[in-house]
Amino acid sequence: MRKHVLQMEKQLKATKKMLLKDCVLKNDIDFNYDFILPFSNAERIKDVKLIFIGQDPTVRNRKSREKIKTTLNLDKENSLKKYLKTVYDIMQVDIEKEIYATNLYKCFFNKPPADDQTILTRQFKIWMDLLINELSVLKNTFVVTLGEPLINQLIHTNSKKVKDYWDYTGKTKSGKNFKCNEPYENYLQRRIYPIAHQPTWNRNKFYKTYLNDYLEYIKQNERKSSKA
């Protein structure tokens, strides 16, 4: 795995050079800070059982950006890591040995994409191509995505609403007929299980109520898939 991360470091340096030469795309990016490498402590690529994907390392306060060194801040104890620990525990996955975490966009943007969606439209192809290449070594590994803006970009067929995969029936209720986005429905060509990002989960009764149920569904569905 260390070799793969080092290879990604080289690819990100090459991507940075390419972006700096683009008179349009370079204006979106804050080049004062390093691009963020993927996170994994797995010894071997084949040990990875779960891929986490976030959208980008959005930090509005520019001075705080220098503190972000790792995808999803997984090198620090914080509310997001505590939230993701629920995922690891229920799915019986070891964060130190069996996960791989990355972002679709590995740079800091000058403006948060939430303030200007055209940023993602411009930047999408270069970063999606890089992500597909990055994950190509992780054979037959499923993906858990964080947040709705991200699945709007990864998914080309079927719903782009997290709640639809959680079988939302209204009034904070779920029918528990959970589902994933199938490989033929997204650009990554993998099973994608969308979950809410931590801030949304924290303030939303529906996601708080059914998180454990959806995670249990993922675990059971992946067991069935591995036996098929």
Model regions: which residues?
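C-terminal capping/extension of enzyme domains
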Residues: 1-31, 111-129, 156-228
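Adenosine ribonucleotide-centric catalytic and binding domains
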Residues: 27-98, 162-169
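Conserved catalytic-core helix/loop/strand module for nucleotide-ribose chemistry
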Residues: 80-114, 189-192
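Short, conserved loop/helix-junction motifs that constitute active-site signature segments
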Residues: 92-94, 135-138, 184-188
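Short, active-site-adjacent cap segments at secondary-structure transitions
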Residues: 59-60, 108, 150-153
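Short, well-ordered beta-to-alpha junction loops that form the rim of enzyme active sites
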Residues: 39, 55-56, 104, 145-150, ...
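Short amphipathic alpha-helical segments
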Residues: 64-65, 155-157
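Internal catalytic-core helix/loop-beta-alpha segment
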Residues: 96-149
